[in-house]
Regions:
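Flexible, glycine/charged-enriched surface loops at secondary-structure junctions
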Residues: 35-40, 200-208, 232-245, 340-352, ...
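Glycine-rich phosphate/diphosphate-binding loop of Rossmann-like nucleotide-binding domains
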Residues: 4-24, 28, 153-246
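N-terminal glycine-rich phosphate/adenylate-binding segment common to multiple enzyme folds
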Residues: 48-162, 269-273
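Glycine-rich phosphate/nucleotide-binding loop
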Residues: 255-354, 361-365
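Glycine-rich phosphate/pyrophosphate-binding loop and the adjoining helix
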Residues: 133-134, 139-190, 197, 345, ...
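N-terminal beta-loop-helix "entrance" segment that forms/cooperates
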Residues: 33-57
């Protein structure tokens, strides 16, 4: 059959086991059917080090140009990785770099298959976590003191006016932390969430702790409410969907009692924690989609999990691993589907959706990677290696094309 043509997307390669899987997916599930048109950036740690991390910035700028990108999982180096890879320095997370440049919101949604039941038995539909991927504790300045003394927060405006507040009079050693966010980033977060809710026709919840954080968290609450009332309420009413704000502790209680089927918007740290909680309760981080959406309509798709280091070391010793490729496949299908939507290329979008269906059908037939076998409640399960599993998905895909 003739290969499907497509518009250009940004391709960002990664590290370790996911880099190996990335190539398998392209070779077996994509290249035989689609004339892949990608602008390639190697975000593997060695090349990031070689370019002084300029490649991460270049990739983000390319996403702004082409509007769609797909990213492999990457290493965020710690001290041990600096030594292992003989790095020039401890480079920042490429995800953080890309998020800061795109000013985006990360939406993570579990991939549901019959036969894997959520730990929370009331959940029937996916719960999407919208995480504000900017600022707060991730951009905090921290200080450790071993002496008594006064800690102050000082803001000096451009005109030289100074505001000063005492944080605490320390009678002994202690720790300090100062964090920030910007109105413009919170506004972008709100717009991304409201637009995503409209696109997916789902209710939107937003939670923080404004009863305790009466300036910081309340600013988030007020900006969300103001933007909703002025720009989105009418469209929400038309679609019959709802936006509401609640405290984070109340939100947790509501989530556990709910049936699912909504978007839960969270501040940066809350979203980091709750996305792992939701993914684990639904099954696995390897069964989770992740897309970074910017308010001006740029999309970056990736797997929600890491580089699967333990499997990579075993792979280097010649062992065939059973690493789950589903989230990485869905990163590709998400990007191809979005490219198809933006370009009016129905053939490309249809292919992406058929590949997703082939993945689900393969698992529901009892063929899966080892990590899913322990969660499986369906027919008898067969644990396959990554390569075997991808080839089974290919067989299912061939039936659907």
């Amino acid at each position: 059959m003739e290969k499907i043509k497509m518009g250009r997307i940004v391709e960002m390669d990664g590290d370790e086991m996911t880099r190996i899987i990335w190539k398998m997916i392209k070779d077996e599930l994509l290249s035989p059917y689609v004339e892949l048109n990608t602008e390639y950036y190697d975000l593997g740690l060695p090349y990031r080090d070689e370019t002084d991390d300029q490649v991460s910035i270049d990739a983000a700028e390319a996403i702004k140009k082409y509007r769609v990108g797909v990213k492999c999982a990457t290493i965020t180096p710690n001290a041990q990785r600096v030594e292992e890879y003989k790095l020039k320095e401890m480079w920042k997370s490429p995800n953080g770099t890309i998020r800061a440049i795109l000013d985006g919101t990360v939406f993570r949604t579990p991939i549901l298959v019959s036969g894997i039941k959520p730990t929370v038995r009331t959940w029937e539909k996916p719960i999407t976590i919208a995480r504000h991927a900017y600022g707060d504790v991730y951009k905090a300045t921290e200080f450790r003191t071993t002496k008594p003394g006064k800690a102050e927060l000082v803001f000096t405006s451009e005109d030289g006016e100074e505001e000063r507040a005492t944080v605490y009079d320390f009678e002994c050693g202690g720790v300090l932390q100062a964090m920030y966010n910007k109105d413009s980033s919170i506004e972008s977060f709100a717009h991304s969430c409201f637009k995503f809710a409209i696109d997916t026709k789902q209710d939107l919840w937003f939670s923080s702790k404004d009863t305790i954080s009466k300036k910081y968290d309340q600013t988030f609450k007020l900006i969300f409410q103001d933007i909703f009332e002025k720009e989105y309420k009418e469209k929400f009413d038309e679609l019959g969907i709802e936006y509401f704000y609640t405290l984070i502790d109340d939100a947790v209680a509501r989530v556990i009692r709910s049936k699912g089927g909504y978007i839960w918007a969270c501040k940066n740290y809350d979203g980091d924690v709750m996305s792992d909680m939701v993914s684990t309760a639904f099954g696995s981080l390897a069964m989770m989609t992740s897309v970074l959406v910017s308010p001006d309509g740029n999309y970056e798709y990736e797997a929600a999990h890491g580089t699967v280091t333990r499997h990579y070391y075993r792979y280097l010793e010649g062992e065939k691993t059973s690493t789950n490729p589903i989230a990485t496949i869905f990163a590709w299908t998400g990007a191809l589907n979005k490219r198809g939507e933006l370009d009016g290329n129905k053939e490309l979008s249809d292919f992406a959706l058929k590949l997703e269906k082939a993945c689900i059908n393969t698992i529901e037939s009892g063929k899966m990677t080892k990590d899913l076998v322990g969660l499986w409640e369906g027919c008898e399960a067969t644990a396959l290696t990554t390569e075997e599993f991808i080839l089974e998905i290919k067989k299912e895909l061939e039936k659907l094309l």
